[in-house]
């Protein structure tokens, strides 16, 4: 499926595609091969400013409205993930206990997170390793794992 992004932000660790509907972030994902777009209005400019500050280690809480989508279970899990503080991590099992669930479904909810960074699934790790990111398994060690490691390092 081809996504059309309202805004593209070039971060130091990867390109971010952002969809905005009714002044709420609808999707924010690391995507390869997108060209930067200029901020269109005050909402776009503020989001761009916050992203820039985050990557400069000068912002640790985003203050932009977003539209959290998914199944009721996914939304429940992602709301718990949203509470993980900057610089902290929790295991899939930790989140599962809070959601009265199991680690694997928590991982699936994180894999389908439509708004990376704002809902910080990169802060959810395995008990014995860093865990996956955006559907990429830790063993693959590809682009998404580079992004997860980089985000955790930024927040270090």
Segments (PLM) and residue ranges:
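Nucleic acid-binding interface residues in structured DNA/RNA-binding domains
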Residues: 3, 7, 62-156
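Low-complexity, small/basic-enriched stretches
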Residues: 1-62, 127-156
